[in-house]
Amino acid sequence: MKNNIINTQQSFVTMPNVIVPDIEKEIRRMENGACSSFSEDDDSASTSEESENENPHARGSFSYKSLRKGGPSQREQYLPGAIALFNVNNSSNKDQEPEEKKKKKKEKKSKSDDKNENKNDPEKKKKKKDKEKKKKEEKSKDKKEEEKKEVVVIDPSGNTYYNWLFCITLPVMYNWTMVIARACFDELQSDYLEYWLILDYVSDIVYLIDMFVRTRTGYLEQGLLVKEELKLINKYKSNLQFKLDVLSLIPTDLLYFKLGWNYPEIRLNRLLRFSRMFEFFQRTETRTNYPNIFRISNLVMYIVIIIHWNACVFYSISKAIGFGNDTWVYPDINDPEFGRLARKYVYSLYWSTLTLTTIGETPPPVRDSEYVFVVVDFLIGVLIFATIVGNIGSMISNMNAARAEFQARIDAIKQYMHFRNVSKDMEKRVIKWFDYLWTNKKTVDEKEVLKYLPDKLRAEIAINVHLDTLKKVRIFADCEAGLLVELVLKLQPQVYSPGDYICKKGDIGREMYIIKEGKLAVVADDGVTQFVVLSDGSYFGEISILNIKGSKAGNRRTANIKSIGYSDLFCLSKDDLMEALTEYPDAKTMLEEKGKQILMKDGLLDLNIANAGSDPKDLEEKVTRMEGSVDLLQTRFARILAEYESMQQKLKQRLTKVEKFLKPLIDTEFSSIEGPGAESGPIDST
């Protein structure tokens, strides 16, 4: 069979009939997935092909070899040329089959082999089970990983969440006010039934959407916003609010079909979403710029809701007792004056307001049930309104606290000026300055307000407020960002009134100034003649705080600067600048170079002194500082040495006292020990 290979190198050859011995066995082998006898030795086939290619006389070797073996036996049959194609190109029969059939055959083989092995080896069964378990565990892990997929999450501190809280608060407020009113006033329910049903089911839809929003609302875990869907859902389910939300959406409206449409009280479970309303109020209080006004309006709303509920209960009790049966209940509704829906509600609201505010002036109760209701109303009114009025009082006092504190400062300064006999003109200037601060809301101490913030946030606020202003200064234009941040934190706001001098010619320059708001004038010595007017963003005094060597002006001011009106300035002191520059030596040299260039342009720099190196005055100052520090260290050392000697003397005195006290006791103890030993005499060791 190894030589039964068709030569396909000649294209003109027609398909021959190939004699295959025992074809039934070959077909069975093919069905079982075994190698066909047509391709038992591919290597030999390929070699025979190569030999045929090399020697054309070998083309007839196939027929010759087959005849030499004696020709076909009785079981050999002829196959047509179509089946002979089955082994063309010297490849195995399996390679010509589709890949799906190969996979099926391999699976059948593996299953049959596994069955045979499992029957023989029980250990292999266990191994197989373990493999299956591992596969299941891996699948479960994959499922869990799929479940941990991140979803779109609403940030609870963002605007989207706040806007949704506003949306969910509207149906909650609707249910809290209208459900009880519709349950007590029958005309209100029956006359506008269609509108109420629309509003009811719209609010229910909003409630359902709110439950979905809760499953997409992130929360912080280790400072990071959780975005995994499964965690968000589990967090919501483990919360008490989930149970209340489910209870609030129980379809109690189905009872309408049994009881009728005049029983809206079956929707009282919708009131359980009150937490969303309170959350909205809380977030609004933190977001608004007028928190005290919002708190007062919020308390007024609570008062109105309580009075509204009490009015509805009063009307329902009157309906149960009978309208007009006595003087306490609501009058007879058959009277046209009291039969209108508006009059019913307004009368009940009036009665509720008088009762809960403990004003009285209402008809006295007649029946026992009426007495009980009035007593309960009085107790509720006393408790609730006492707390509400107390809160309103504290809010109003907090609103006036800043004004009271500011007024206390003014009163103290007035007393001081009166005690020191300050002139009336100066007193008026001081009072006007305080009035300017109060009217323009500049009484806030920035350091006091920002001291509770962390350093990073404080720096960011200072950068947002002052950095652009500081960059306008020429010498700070190209400085490092870190140095600018340090300087921004050291800027001090100052307010000057009209006619105040910021600096005068000849003054020692210890600060530089940046104009935030207002106008300053460079004036002559007479204080009237104006040379230049400085406006917002201008600055001056930057050279004096650098203490540049060779400056002809020295460290003194060269002009008179006066405030024309009220002016807001930022001040940077020399000490603060030098403290910041200790960490930035390169920036210090750069600033000095810029200052020298500015002085050279103005002709105020002595180049000989500037290029002379270190100033001897600076060296003398350093030497004097070193001497002072050495003297200080010597005095401290002498003080410590004196303290050590005094402590040593005190310790010696205490030791002598202890010796004097313990000496007689030790002598008596030794005498008592030696006494019996002396009487008994020496002991014979033998």
UniProtKB/Swiss-Prot annotation:
Residues 110-124, 135-149 have a biased composition (Basic and acidic residues). Residues 619-673 form a coiled coil. Residues 31-75, 87-149 are annotated as: Disordered. Channel opening is activated by cGMP and at a much lesser extent by cAMP. Ca(2+) binding concominantly blocks monovalent cation currents. Inhibited by L-cis-diltiazem. Residues 358-361 are annotated as: Selectivity filter. One of its GO terms (cellular component) is plasma membrane. Residues 1-165, 219-243, 287-293, 401-686 are cytoplasmic. CDD domains: CAP_ED. Residues 125-134 have a biased composition (Basic residues). Rod cells in the retina. GO terms for molecular function: calcium channel activity; cAMP binding; cGMP binding; intracellularly cAMP-activated cation channel activity; intracellularly cGMP-activated cation channel activity; protein-containing complex binding; sodium channel activity. Belongs to the cyclic nucleotide-gated cation channel (TC 1.A.1.5) family. CNGA1 subfamily. This is Cyclic nucleotide-gated channel alpha-1. The lineage of its organism: Eukaryota, Metazoa, Chordata, Craniata, Vertebrata. The gene is CNGA1.
